[in-house]
Amino acid sequence: MMMENGLSMEYGDGYMEQEEEWEREGLLDPAWEKQQKKTFTAWCNSHLRKAGTAIDNIEEDFRNGLKLMLLLEVISGETLPKPDRGKMRFHKIANVNKALDFIASKGVHLVSIGAEEIVDGNLKMTLGMIWTIILRFAIQDISVEEMTAKEGLLLWCQRKTAPYKNVNVQNFHLSFKDGLAFCALIHRHRPDLIDYAKLSKDNPLENLNTAFDVAEKYLDIPRMLDPDDLINTPKPDERAIMTYVSCYYHAFQGAQQVGNNTALPDERAVMTYVSSYYHCFSGAQKAETAANRICKVLKVNQENERLMEEYERLASDLLEWIRRTMPWLNSRQADNSLAGVQKKLEEYRTYRRKHKPPRVEQKAKLETNFNTLQTKLRLSNRPAYLPTEGKTVSDISNSWKGLELAEKAFEEWLLAETMRLERLEHLAQKFKHKADAHEDWTRGKEEMLQSQDFRQCKLNELKALKKKHEAFESDLAAHQDRVEQIAAIAQELNTLEYHDCVSVNARCQRICDQWDRLGALTQRRRTALDEAERILEKIDILHLEFAKRAAPFNNWLDGTREDLVDMFIVHTMEEIQGLIQAHDQFKATLGEADKEFNLIVNLVREVESIVKQHQIPGGLENPYTTLTANDMTRKWSDVRQLVPQRDQTLANELRKQQNNEMLRRQFAEKANIVGPWIERQMDAVTAIGMGLQGSLEDQLHRLKEYEQAVYAYKPNIEELEKIHQAVQESMIFENRYTNYTMETLRVGWEQLLTSINRNINEVENQILTRDSKGISQEQLNEFRSSFNHFDKNRTGRLSPEEFKSCLVSLGYSIGKDRQGDLDFQRILAVVDPNNTGYVHFDAFLDFMTRESTDTDTAEQVIDSFRILAADKPYILPDELRRELPPDQAEYCIQRMPPYKGPNGVPGALDYMSFSTALYGETDL
């Protein structure tokens, strides 16, 4: 057939590729061989059972070629050449060749498959031949989007199972192992056969059995696969699964659409099958034709009646609607407001947008139905339809035209009324806008003009208020035009009969009345401001005059008060007399001051009178000064009171200075006697201390006589102390009548006593030294004369340089080298052991007597201790206690250091160190 030839031409190359693939791969896996054998056997039996036969062993039952030819006839629907009935090998080969030739005639190129292998029972070749047949007659006709049969079948499976979870078909081996893909294919086409929601990917055996059982029972697809083989085989045989899945494809494709496959059913078989139906039902055909003719006539008549009834109904409804609408369109009543007209316009637009379009469609449908009805009646030889009176097409058309004219007139009226009312509304809005602006401007103006705020102002603030009022007057004049415009707009609204003229007129009247009040209040405030300015200017002049006079007068008062209460300090009669004279001159000026005070007070009284008369708050505050009349009055009163107090103070001070003058004279008279006496006595004592006259005993006698005379003069000092105490109590610090002060006299008196005592002590020490050292009076006088010669200042002491010069003058040799300096420093350490920096006469005399007389030395004492110690270098405490008195023995034991030399015994004392320490030759 032509389609078969087309398929042969289109798919020939594909078959060759499949056969070559078969030859290359072979059946190396026993599991795959088992699956293919079982699947192919089931597939063959699914077709052979239609011929009333089956096979048990695929490699044995096809060896004679008879069932092979029968299988091809069943699946192709064609008749093959008559088979040979012999049982010889060549008969079998001939039958198999007939089958193979038939396959080749379908465009399938068989490669490496010969009749001999089939006859010999070669399982591999037999399965390959069956797979070729399956490809040609079961899979080849599967075509999806111009893909190969295998790819098309795979794509078909993917599309059908796409909506199902846990199903992802990518191939024909692993993707079908869990059985969900088989169940999904069945459920997609027959959801009534499987409850897919109860299936689980974890139970593949149950899924496979469910799919195979349902397919065999309800879809007439034989059980070609074994679930255990699919589960236990790592990679199931692809060809076995493809063969089985192709049965699903054909089963569901056939259920959806007959003849949709690529290979069409045999034409002769279909014609033969249909002719049987024709002969079966040919007797009932005439009766059916007659019944159909009657039904057709009745149906046309019923349709015509339906159209007539519908026309009547539509015509009545449309005319009734027009009748109800016309009064509304002809109405010209409105509330004379833009909102009311706009509401009517919106109602009209709603009518045109919502209500009329359905009626237009109704009218068009009415005319269409009428024309259709007349045409059908004419074609069916029926009389023309005549509507009831008043419902003809012309009646409806006339009513419709009247409606459209009414609509046009109504719309024109609405637009004209809208324009008129918009004009009125614009004027009303303009009136409102100007009135609002005017009222905003006037808000608070009356209160401002009626305000008495200027009564609280000072002059500068009042002038600012006046300037502000002048600006307001200018602004008021400028607003005159606005008020006139408001009145003109209100007049126009009245002329055009605005619907709310009452409120417009009332508002306009309020504005005009308020404008008149503002004018009157403005003039009244102007007058009040001028009067207030005049009064405040007068007060300001008085304040300024007060400030000019009060400031210098206040300064004079402050200065005067300070002078009157000034705590003056005077020490002489001349000073107090000068103060009294100045105070008398000041009192002479009080008359003029009293006049100035009265003038200042009168200025304040005048201000107070004006403020009280006009009740001006804060008018008494003077902006030019902080001084007040009360300040002036208080200070002037203080001055008047302080003047007599100052008189009394000056009088008291005068009496005090007179008494002080008397005390000065009294102290001076006594001090001028005591001071020279002390000086004379001091000179006499100093002369005696120089030791140049008489013996030491004579000097001592004379000093003691002076001592008695000085103590006898002490009452004069005590009397002078009493006078001095009175002077101090009177705070007298200067005395021009004497050069002596109590301090100088007291110091002189104390120095006199000290000098007498010191000289007595020195003379007594000199006598003791002379007697103990055995020096003569001449030597002593010589030492005194030398000491006094170098004591230039008569201080009774020599500096180191003076002492050195004195030694040289007495014949003492002191070198000028370093050794001489060391010797002199040793001598200074003897005569000035306390390092005071001076050498007194006693130390000088002691040094000179030691140098000039035979005195005891450290060596002499050491020799004495050596005798007591029996020539030992140390001495024991018992030896000291035995030879010396107890007190002197204990004195030596306590002060002698322990002996640290050789051959010492416990308790031994170092008498050598002790002896040298006694004479200052080493540290003890």
Swiss-Prot record:
Subunit (UniProt): Homodimer; antiparallel. Interacts with Smn; the interaction occurs in adult thoracic tissues.
Gene Ontology CC: cell junction; cell projection; cortical actin cytoskeleton; focal adhesion; plasma membrane; Z disc
Ranges: Spectrin repeats: 251-395, 396-510, 511-631, 632-744
Xref: InterPro entries: Actinin_actin-bd_CS, CH_dom, CH_dom_sf, EF-hand-dom_pair, EF-hand_Ca_insen, EF_Hand_1_Ca_BS, EF_hand_dom, Spectrin/alpha-actinin
Superkingdom to which the source organism belongs: Eukaryota
GO biological process: one example: muscle cell development
Name of this protein: Alpha-actinin, sarcomeric
Lineage of the species this protein comes from: Eukaryota, Metazoa, Ecdysozoa, Arthropoda, Hexapoda
Organism, as annotated: Drosophila melanogaster (Fruit fly)
Pfam families, per the entry: CH, EF-hand_6, EFhand_Ca_insen, Spectrin
Main localization category: cytoplasm
Span list, region Actin-binding: 1-250
Gene3D superfamilies: 1.20.58.60, Calponin-like domain (1.10.418.10), EF-hand (1.10.238.10)
